[in-house]
């Protein structure tokens, strides 16, 4: 099956698993997905993730995080899509819910949060927004 937007697929898997109250999900692996999941873990939105190299195709297991039975991620959405890319300069990077949420940006210095990109003085492609 040809997947045109693997990042949107990953975000949809997370959203669907949390609405079904699943503890763990598996998905195909890529460097960009691992970078996004690393940021989600650092920001406290997921418990953990690890790569499973045992399969023919490498996959990632993600352990989702809940607080009092409610998902920690209230909304997760893709901003830049294959049909309509969204690039922002360092001055145009959004502040999500006045700093309570996080926007993930792909820059020339790697994948980082909008706060880190603003401090580093770089802009880039706005991948997704998480609250």
Swiss-Prot record:
**Record GO terms (molecular function):** rRNA binding; structural constituent of ribosome
Do you know which InterPro entries this protein is assigned to?
Ribosomal_uS8 (IPR000630), Ribosomal_uS8_CS (IPR047863), Ribosomal_uS8_sf (IPR035987)
GO annotations of cellular component type:
ribonucleoprotein complex; ribosome
Read off the SUPFAM superfamilies from this record: Ribosomal protein S8
Q: Which domain of life is it from?
A: Bacteria
NCBIfam families per UniProt: PRK00136.1
Q: Which family does it belong to?
A: Belongs to the universal ribosomal protein uS8 family.
GO biological process entries: translation
The record describes its quaternary structure and partners as: Part of the 30S ribosomal subunit. Contacts proteins S5 and S12.
Task: State what this protein does.
Answer: One of the primary rRNA binding proteins, it binds directly to 16S rRNA central domain where it helps coordinate assembly of the platform of the 30S subunit.
Endpoints of the signal sequence: none
Has the keyword Ribonucleoprotein been applied to this entry?
yes
Keywords, alphabetical = Ribonucleoprotein, Ribosomal protein, RNA-binding, rRNA-binding
What name is this protein filed under? Small ribosomal subunit protein uS8
């Amino acid at each position: 099956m040809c997947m045109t937007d693997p990042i949107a697929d990953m975000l949809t898997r997370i959203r669907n698993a949390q609405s079904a109250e699943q503890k763990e999900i598996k998905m195909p692996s890529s460097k960009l997905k691992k970078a996004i999941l690393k940021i989600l873990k650092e920001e406290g939105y997921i418990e953990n993730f690890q790569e499973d190299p045992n399969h023919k195709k490498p996959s990632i297991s993600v352990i989702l995080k809940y607080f009092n039975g409610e998902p920690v991620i209230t909304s997760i959405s893709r901003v830049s899509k294959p049909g309509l890319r969204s690039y922002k300069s360092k001055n145009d990077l959004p502040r999500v819910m006045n700093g309570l949420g996080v926007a993930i940006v792909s820059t020339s210095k790697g994948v980082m949060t909008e706060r880190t990109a603003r401090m580093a003085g770089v802009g880039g492609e706005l991948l997704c927004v998480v609250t």
